Amino acid sequence: VILRGQIFDIERFRPTESGETASPLSPEELDEYTYLVAGSVGEFWTRICCQHILGYTSKSLEDLLPVARRFGQALQLVNILRDRRSDADIGRVYIPDQRFYAEMEHVGELLTAGDEYTASVVPRMLRAACLLPLDLARRTLALVAEHPLGERVKVPRYIVWFALIRAMIFKEEIQIDLIREKQ
């Protein structure tokens, strides 16, 4: 599946002899692309963890797979939004400017799947491993929102370290907060 996503990317954005760039992805193509390169990864690791880690989740595999898919897609969409100018410079326009705000809203909705997924992970260290990319994605998205013209943004290294420590130390408290918010 991941290879299909990479092939899709290469073929879709192949340079033409005339030097024209490909049109931006449609919302449907973007959904397919983010599934192929990231949503499928969420499904894959969820299957592996459910099969090999006793008590991995409080949900059934059937219920968790669509959540894993959306969580993976959300993380990829954050990267696409973050890199949209540098990607455009090399002829890859995943999201046209006129859809920027709609996709910012959409990725915010998709990230709630990360909350749901993380809340369902039982082993504390694995829960922390889910919290870290979720936290960094939200921080990155906030920076992207502050720079809507597409300037390259990056979460500072000290914030990354802070997020790592926060995920490791406060994993139970964060989970309790997430569960309370859902009720």
Report the location of each language-model feature.
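Catalytic cores of Mg2+-dependent Asp-rich isoprenoid enzymes
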Residues: 1-74, 81-183
